[in-house]
Structure formats: C-alpha cells, structure tokens
Regions:
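Conserved AAA+ ATPase small/helical "lid" subdomain
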Residues: 232-287
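Non-catalytic, well-ordered alpha-helical scaffold segments
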Residues: 21, 155, 196, 200, ...
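Alpha-helix N-cap/helix-initiation sites
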Residues: 16, 214, 262-263, 279-285, ...
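C-terminal engagement/docking regions of AAA+ P-loop ATPases
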Residues: 44, 268-282, 293-343
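Charged, low-complexity terminal tails
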Residues: 1-2, 327
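Conserved AAA+ ATPase core "coupling" helix
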Residues: 108-113, 194-253
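Contiguous, well-ordered alpha-helical segments that form the cores/surfaces of helical PPI scaffolds
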Residues: 20-29, 286-296
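Conserved ASCE/P-loop NTPase catalytic core
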Residues: 2-215
Length: 343
C-alpha cells in the first residue's frame, strides 16, 4: 500500500472523539452542511480530515471529467458530460475521495473558476477554467483559518455547499457545474471570529483543545514516534480497526436513507431549539439529519433520544446567542439534558 505523509490512521488518533464523530456524520450525510472545528493549532484537525478521506468508499466517476461526475446521475452531470453522452456511453472509472485545500489567499476567480470572455464573445463558446469548487465536487473541501477569509469568499463557499452547484457569471455569460462536497472549516477563535450569519450556515461545530490527560498525552507522543519511524508497520497495526470503521461508514451510507425519524423526535428537537432561543429553523433540520446519520452509524433503524443527545451540542453550540456576563440565559448543556431527560 502506498502511503504518504498525511495518511496517519483515523483510529490511531487519540481523543478528540466529538471532532471525529462530526466528520464521520458529514461523510454519511453531506447534507448536514459541513463542520466548523474551532481550536488551537496542533490538535489533530487536519490529520483527522485526511485520515477520514482514506476510510470513505471509492466513487464511480466519468473518466476524463473535470468535475468527477457520477455516471449514473445524469441530473447532476456537467455540460461536457451531457454533450459527450449524446455520442454514446460515457467511460467510467473509480477514484478515492480526496481532500481539496483552499489557499488562505485565494481570489474569487481561483475559488469559482474563470470564463474566457474573449472566446465567448468572438466564438460563442463557453471556455471555462475550473476553480477550487470544481476540484471539490464529490470530495472534501478543507478550509484552514476560515475566519481569516474575506466574508464574500466564505459566502461563496457556503452557497455552493448548500446548493450543490457553482454558477459563474461574467458580462452576461453564465456557466454552472456540480459542486457537492463535505465542507470542513477550521479556525482559532483567538485570531478573530466569524459573523453569526456565517456561523449558522455550518451544519455542525466542535471545539477542540490540547488533551490534558497525562496518559493520553504520552500515548500521542509514543504513537507519533512509531509512525515516523515506520509508517507502514504502524498502519498495519491499525489495519483491522481501520477496516472496521471503513465498513461501518460504508454500511451507514447505504442504510441512512431508510432510517426513520419519529414525530416525537422532531418535537424533541424543536423543543430544544425553542428553549435555546435559536433563530430560524436551520438548527432543527441539521439536528434531524445528524441524528439520522448517527442512528445509521449505530446500525439502528430508527432515530432515538440517545442519537439526538449525542449530536445536539455540536448542532446548537454555535447558534446559541451569547449573553452578557451576569445576565443569565439558556445554558446549552443544561437545556439539552433537561429536554432529553423528560422523554
């Protein structure tokens, strides 16, 4: 097996269970809307994202397609695949999901792609140079220090993540292509916050910090030393646990659409949102989707109270209004515990 310097096993990561769960849930159901990971550097954020990509199932793609279109999903084909399909069956190959990184200084053109206006005006052709959102289609889009990006760029990313389509318009010329991806943003709150309107559009949010447990800190150093000395041996030592999680994710992706969501669970989610005084209804939708994904991951056929309890904090943490010191207000953990405990 060819290994690169980023392929540290997912199951070898010590601690950070909430972060790992948030990533897995988005892999099972990308409509959750991505995850924002807040915390200091050196806490395994990028390592976990790259390790997750190795666990996800291979994809069928149209060979030669810039956007990695799925051959069996013509409604989501790009213009090139539609045109090629008129001349016969499309060639098919497989690929693994990969992590596409957004450079911190990326321009809007680099993100969305560029249209050759000269060719459009002179020849009537639509020559398009794909951007990061094209590379990200059916992959993981990793945005480090998302809080340092221009707000407009963040808006563009979140729009594409929500719609599954990237549309570029220049001088009356328009090009659209599929752009469905798992969005993972990271930030250090000490370097600046995101506007609440942008925070709300991330499906899940988790806070990570350096591990304080003595034994776990020692284990991190020991594991890293073994990994750096012989990565192939280290990976083989974790091959069984990696395969178990890989199979669990693949099964959950397949069964997720069949997981039922009882009305009483929807009422519980709504009660939590009301008690926390959360604006809008996005939190209810995300919580329902995340709880369904957790149920599928647990091989359960129906969402239960425990599934809501396990995902609620990562759904609501970034959506609860901050309250001035001494003024009181809803406490996230207390509200969730109280609501779940009454069921």
């Amino acid at each position: 097996m060819a290994l690169d310097r980023y392929s540290y096993p997912f199951t070898a990561i010590v601690g950070q269970d909430e972060m790992k769960l948030a990533l897995v849930l988005n892999a099972i159901n990308p409509t959750i809307g991505g995850v924002l990971i807040r915390g200091e550097k050196g806490t395994g954020k990028s390592t976990a994202v790259r390790a997750l990509a190795r666990l996800l199932p291979e994809q069928m793609v149209v060979e030669g397609c810039h956007f990695g279109c799925h051959p069996d999903d013509p409604e989501d084909w790009c213009a090139d695949c539609r045109e090629r399909a008129e001349n016969g069956p499309l060639p098919v190959t497989t690929r693994r999901m990969r992590v596409v990184e957004l450079p911190i200084n990326a321009s809007e053109d680099r993100v969305v792609g560029t249209i050759d206006l000269e060719a459009a005006l002179k020849e009537g052709s639509r020559r398009f140079e794909p951007g990061v959102l094209a590379e990200a289609n059916r992959n993981i889009l990793y945005v480090d220090e998302v809080n340092l990006l221009d707000d407009h760029i963040v808006d563009v990313l979140l729009d594409a993540a929500a719609m599954g389509v990237n549309t570029v318009e220049r001088e009356g010329v328009s090009v659209s292509h599929p752009s469905r991806f798992i969005l993972v943003g990271t930030m250090n709150p000490e370097e600046g916050e995101l506007r609440p309107q942008l925070l709300d559009r991330f499906g899940l949010c988790v806070d990570v910090e350096g591990i304080r447990d003595l034994d776990q800190r020692v284990a991190i150093v020991e594991k890293r030393a073994v990994w750096e000395d012989d990565p192939n041996l280290f990976y083989q030592q974790h091959a069984e646990s990696e395969q178990a999680v890989r199979s669990q994710i693949a099964e959950a992706i397949g069964t997720f659409p069949e997981v039922t969501l009882p009305r009483e669970i929807l009422r519980l989610i709504a009660q939590i949102s009301i008690a926390l005084e959360v604006d809008g209804h996005r939190s209810d939708l995300v919580c329902a989707r995340a709880a369904q994904a957790k149920a599928a991951y647990d091989s359960d056929e129906q969402v239960g109270v425990s599934h809501v309890s396990e995902v609620a904090e990562m759904v609501f943490a970034h959506r609860v209004h901050s309250v001035p010191f001494g003024k009181g207000g809803p406490n996230l953990g207390e509200v969730i515990s109280r609501m779940v405990g009454t069921q």
